[in-house]
Protein backbone atom coordinates (compact mmCIF):
# COMPACT_ATOMS: atom_id res chain seq x y z
CA UNK A 1 0.00 0.00 0.00
CA UNK A 2 1.59 3.27 -1.13
CA UNK A 3 1.17 6.29 1.15
CA UNK A 4 0.55 9.46 -0.84
CA UNK A 5 -0.22 13.11 -0.06
CA UNK A 6 -1.86 14.37 3.12
CA UNK A 7 -5.58 14.77 2.56
CA UNK A 8 -6.59 16.29 5.89
CA UNK A 9 -4.91 17.31 9.14
CA UNK A 10 -7.10 17.32 12.24
CA UNK A 11 -6.28 18.22 15.83
CA UNK A 12 -4.73 14.84 16.65
CA UNK A 13 -4.70 12.79 13.43
CA UNK A 14 -3.61 13.17 9.82
CA UNK A 15 -5.29 11.44 6.87
CA UNK A 16 -3.34 10.35 3.79
CA UNK A 17 -4.39 9.13 0.37
CA UNK A 18 -3.13 5.77 -0.87
CA UNK A 19 -2.86 4.10 -4.27
CA UNK A 20 -6.26 2.48 -3.54
CA UNK A 21 -9.18 4.88 -4.11
CA UNK A 22 -11.20 3.15 -1.36
CA UNK A 23 -8.48 3.18 1.32
CA UNK A 24 -6.81 5.86 3.44
CA UNK A 25 -4.05 5.88 6.04
CA UNK A 26 -4.74 7.41 9.47
CA UNK A 27 -1.70 8.76 11.32
CA UNK A 28 -2.21 9.21 15.06
CA UNK A 29 -0.02 12.09 16.26
CA UNK A 30 1.14 12.97 19.78
CA UNK A 31 -0.81 16.24 19.64
CA UNK A 32 -3.33 16.57 22.46
CA UNK A 33 -5.95 19.31 22.27
CA UNK A 34 -8.74 20.68 24.41
CA UNK A 35 -11.35 23.44 24.21
CA UNK A 36 -11.86 23.13 20.43
CA UNK A 37 -8.14 23.25 19.71
CA UNK A 38 -7.39 26.35 21.81
CA UNK A 39 -4.94 24.35 23.94
CA UNK A 40 -2.56 21.91 22.24
CA UNK A 41 0.36 20.00 23.76
CA UNK A 42 2.58 17.10 22.74
CA UNK A 43 2.34 13.97 24.90
CA UNK A 44 4.91 11.24 24.31
CA UNK A 45 3.50 7.84 23.23
CA UNK A 46 -0.04 9.18 22.79
CA UNK A 47 -0.22 8.52 19.04
CA UNK A 48 0.96 4.94 19.51
CA UNK A 49 -1.38 4.24 22.43
CA UNK A 50 -4.46 5.66 20.68
CA UNK A 51 -3.69 3.89 17.39
CA UNK A 52 -3.41 0.48 19.05
CA UNK A 53 -6.30 1.16 21.43
CA UNK A 54 -8.51 2.14 18.50
CA UNK A 55 -7.51 -0.99 16.54
CA UNK A 56 -8.40 -3.19 19.52
CA UNK A 57 -11.81 -1.56 20.04
CA UNK A 58 -12.72 -1.49 16.35
CA UNK A 59 -11.94 -5.20 16.01
CA UNK A 60 -14.14 -5.96 19.05
CA UNK A 61 -16.97 -3.97 17.46
CA UNK A 62 -16.55 -5.66 14.08
CA UNK A 63 -16.77 -9.05 15.82
CA UNK A 64 -20.05 -7.88 17.42
CA UNK A 65 -21.54 -6.90 14.06
CA UNK A 66 -20.76 -3.17 13.96
CA UNK A 67 -19.28 -2.17 10.57
CA UNK A 68 -16.17 0.00 11.04
CA UNK A 69 -13.72 1.67 8.69
CA UNK A 70 -10.73 -0.05 10.32
CA UNK A 71 -8.79 -2.47 8.12
CA UNK A 72 -5.44 -3.16 9.78
CA UNK A 73 -2.53 -1.69 11.72
CA UNK A 74 0.38 -0.51 9.60
CA UNK A 75 2.74 0.46 12.42
CA UNK A 76 2.88 2.03 15.86
CA UNK A 77 1.16 5.24 14.74
CA UNK A 78 -0.64 4.31 11.52
CA UNK A 79 -3.56 2.19 10.38
CA UNK A 80 -5.29 1.47 7.08
CA UNK A 81 -8.97 2.40 6.88
CA UNK A 82 -11.82 2.46 4.39
CA UNK A 83 -12.44 5.81 2.72
CA UNK A 84 -15.78 7.21 3.89
CA UNK A 85 -17.86 10.23 2.98
CA UNK A 86 -18.14 11.50 6.55
CA UNK A 87 -21.44 12.79 7.93
CA UNK A 88 -20.66 16.03 9.87
CA UNK A 89 -22.56 14.96 12.97
CA UNK A 90 -21.23 13.59 16.25
CA UNK A 91 -23.37 10.99 18.02
CA UNK A 92 -22.96 11.11 21.80
CA UNK A 93 -24.20 8.37 24.13
CA UNK A 94 -24.21 9.14 27.86
CA UNK A 95 -24.56 6.56 30.62
CA UNK A 96 -23.61 8.94 33.45
CA UNK A 97 -23.86 12.73 33.71
CA UNK A 98 -20.59 14.50 32.90
CA UNK A 99 -19.09 17.22 30.73
CA UNK A 100 -21.40 19.49 28.76
CA UNK A 101 -24.53 17.72 30.03
CA UNK A 102 -23.72 18.82 33.59
CA UNK A 103 -23.09 22.41 32.45
CA UNK A 104 -26.19 22.51 30.26
CA UNK A 105 -28.70 21.05 32.72
CA UNK A 106 -27.08 21.68 36.09
CA UNK A 107 -27.25 18.04 37.15
CA UNK A 108 -24.74 16.35 39.45
CA UNK A 109 -21.65 14.86 37.83
CA UNK A 110 -21.67 11.08 38.06
CA UNK A 111 -25.46 10.73 38.21
CA UNK A 112 -26.46 7.46 36.52
CA UNK A 113 -28.79 8.03 33.60
CA UNK A 114 -31.62 5.54 33.28
CA UNK A 115 -31.91 4.97 30.45
CA UNK A 116 -28.85 6.35 28.63
CA UNK A 117 -29.24 9.52 26.55
CA UNK A 118 -28.47 9.87 22.84
CA UNK A 119 -27.48 13.32 21.55
CA UNK A 120 -26.34 14.90 18.30
CA UNK A 121 -23.80 17.68 17.78
CA UNK A 122 -22.76 19.42 14.57
CA UNK A 123 -19.07 18.77 13.90
CA UNK A 124 -17.92 22.38 13.50
CA UNK A 125 -15.09 23.69 15.70
CA UNK A 126 -15.65 27.29 14.60
CA UNK A 127 -19.19 27.14 15.98
CA UNK A 128 -18.22 25.16 19.08
CA UNK A 129 -19.81 21.88 17.91
CA UNK A 130 -23.38 23.04 18.67
CA UNK A 131 -26.08 20.75 20.09
CA UNK A 132 -28.59 19.85 17.33
CA UNK A 133 -31.51 17.48 16.77
CA UNK A 134 -32.62 15.06 14.07
CA UNK A 135 -34.75 17.62 12.22
CA UNK A 136 -31.75 19.96 11.87
CA UNK A 137 -29.70 17.16 10.30
CA UNK A 138 -32.35 16.42 7.68
CA UNK A 139 -33.39 20.05 7.06
CA UNK A 140 -29.83 21.23 6.41
CA UNK A 141 -28.87 18.19 4.37
CA UNK A 142 -26.19 16.85 6.70
CA UNK A 143 -27.79 13.40 6.56
CA UNK A 144 -31.04 11.58 5.80
CA UNK A 145 -33.61 10.24 8.26
CA UNK A 146 -32.61 6.70 7.24
CA UNK A 147 -28.92 7.41 7.86
CA UNK A 148 -29.72 8.91 11.25
CA UNK A 149 -31.76 5.88 12.25
CA UNK A 150 -28.86 3.59 11.34
CA UNK A 151 -26.36 5.81 13.16
CA UNK A 152 -28.49 5.67 16.31
CA UNK A 153 -28.92 1.90 16.01
CA UNK A 154 -25.16 1.39 15.68
CA UNK A 155 -24.38 3.87 18.49
CA UNK A 156 -26.59 1.94 20.91
CA UNK A 157 -25.01 -1.35 19.81
CA UNK A 158 -21.57 0.13 20.49
CA UNK A 159 -22.78 1.18 23.94
CA UNK A 160 -24.04 -2.32 24.67
CA UNK A 161 -20.80 -4.00 23.58
CA UNK A 162 -18.34 -1.56 25.14
CA UNK A 163 -20.17 -0.98 28.43
CA UNK A 164 -19.69 -4.67 29.18
CA UNK A 165 -16.10 -4.70 27.90
CA UNK A 166 -15.10 -1.81 30.15
CA UNK A 167 -17.17 -3.08 33.09
CA UNK A 168 -15.25 -6.36 32.94
CA UNK A 169 -12.06 -4.28 33.18
CA UNK A 170 -13.28 -2.42 36.28
CA UNK A 171 -14.20 0.74 34.37
CA UNK A 172 -17.37 2.78 33.86
CA UNK A 173 -18.08 3.91 30.31
CA UNK A 174 -19.45 7.32 31.27
CA UNK A 175 -20.04 8.68 27.77
CA UNK A 176 -18.54 8.65 24.29
CA UNK A 177 -18.81 10.24 20.87
CA UNK A 178 -18.93 8.49 17.51
CA UNK A 179 -18.68 9.65 13.92
CA UNK A 180 -20.09 7.83 10.92
CA UNK A 181 -19.60 7.96 7.17
CA UNK A 182 -20.95 6.46 3.97
CA UNK A 183 -18.80 3.82 2.24
CA UNK A 184 -18.66 3.42 -1.55
CA UNK A 185 -21.43 0.78 -1.40
CA UNK A 186 -23.79 3.23 0.34
CA UNK A 187 -23.61 1.59 3.77
CA UNK A 188 -23.25 3.52 7.04
CA UNK A 189 -19.93 2.71 8.69
CA UNK A 190 -18.37 3.74 12.02
CA UNK A 191 -15.44 6.05 11.26
CA UNK A 192 -12.86 8.23 13.00
CA UNK A 193 -11.58 6.55 16.19
CA UNK A 194 -12.51 5.17 19.58
CA UNK A 195 -9.93 6.02 22.24
CA UNK A 196 -9.73 7.76 25.64
CA UNK A 197 -9.61 11.01 23.66
CA UNK A 198 -13.28 10.63 22.70
CA UNK A 199 -14.90 8.94 25.68
CA UNK A 200 -15.01 9.24 29.44
CA UNK A 201 -13.81 6.30 31.51
CA UNK A 202 -13.81 6.18 35.30
CA UNK A 203 -12.48 3.55 37.65
CA UNK A 204 -15.53 1.68 38.96
CA UNK A 205 -14.44 1.80 42.60
CA UNK A 206 -12.56 5.08 43.01
CA UNK A 207 -14.22 7.08 40.17
CA UNK A 208 -10.72 8.16 39.10
CA UNK A 209 -10.85 9.73 35.65
CA UNK A 210 -8.92 7.69 33.08
CA UNK A 211 -9.51 9.74 29.91
CA UNK A 212 -8.78 13.11 28.29
CA UNK A 213 -10.46 14.94 31.17
CA UNK A 214 -7.10 14.44 32.90
CA UNK A 215 -5.67 16.80 30.26
CA UNK A 216 -8.65 19.18 30.15
CA UNK A 217 -8.72 19.54 33.94
CA UNK A 218 -4.94 19.58 34.53
CA UNK A 219 -4.96 16.34 36.57
CA UNK A 220 -1.70 15.05 35.07
CA UNK A 221 -0.58 11.50 34.22
CA UNK A 222 -2.66 11.53 31.03
CA UNK A 223 -0.77 8.88 29.06
CA UNK A 224 -0.21 6.79 32.17
CA UNK A 225 -4.00 6.63 32.59
CA UNK A 226 -4.49 5.73 28.91
CA UNK A 227 -1.89 2.97 29.23
CA UNK A 228 -3.54 1.62 32.38
CA UNK A 229 -6.88 1.40 30.58
CA UNK A 230 -5.17 -0.39 27.68
CA UNK A 231 -3.46 -2.80 30.08
CA UNK A 232 -6.75 -3.61 31.85
CA UNK A 233 -8.38 -4.39 28.51
CA UNK A 234 -5.46 -6.46 27.27
CA UNK A 235 -4.51 -4.11 24.43
CA UNK A 236 -1.04 -5.04 23.12
CA UNK A 237 1.02 -1.83 23.12
Curated annotation (Swiss-Prot):
Record's protein name: Phosphoribosylaminoimidazole-succinocarboxamide synthase
Keyword Nucleotide-binding: yes
Source species of the chain: Pseudomonas fluorescens (strain ATCC BAA-477 / NRRL B-23932 / Pf-5)
Record-linked InterPro entries: SAICAR_synt/ADE2_N, SAICAR_synt_PurC, SAICAR_synth, SAICAR_synthetase, SAICAR_synthetase_CS
Gene Ontology cellular component annotations, sorted alphabetically: cytosol
Catalysed conversion reaction: 5-amino-1-(5-phospho-D-ribosyl)imidazole-4-carboxylate + L-aspartate + ATP = (2S)-2-[5-amino-1-(5-phospho-beta-D-ribosyl)imidazole-4-carboxamido]succinate + ADP + phosphate + 2 H(+)
Annotated EC: 6.3.2.6
Designated gene of the protein: purC
Keyword terms: ATP-binding, Ligase, Nucleotide-binding, Purine biosynthesis
One BP term from GO: cobalamin biosynthetic process
Keyword ATP-binding in record: yes
GO MF, any single term: ATP binding
Family listed: Belongs to the SAICAR synthetase family.
Amino acid sequence: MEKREELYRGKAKSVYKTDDADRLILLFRNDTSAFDGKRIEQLDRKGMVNNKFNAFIMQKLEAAGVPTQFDKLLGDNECLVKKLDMIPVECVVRNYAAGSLVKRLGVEEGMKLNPYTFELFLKDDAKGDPFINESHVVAFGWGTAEQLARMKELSLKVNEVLSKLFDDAGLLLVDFKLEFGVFSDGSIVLGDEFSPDGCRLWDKDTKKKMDKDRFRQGLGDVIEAYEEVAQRLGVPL
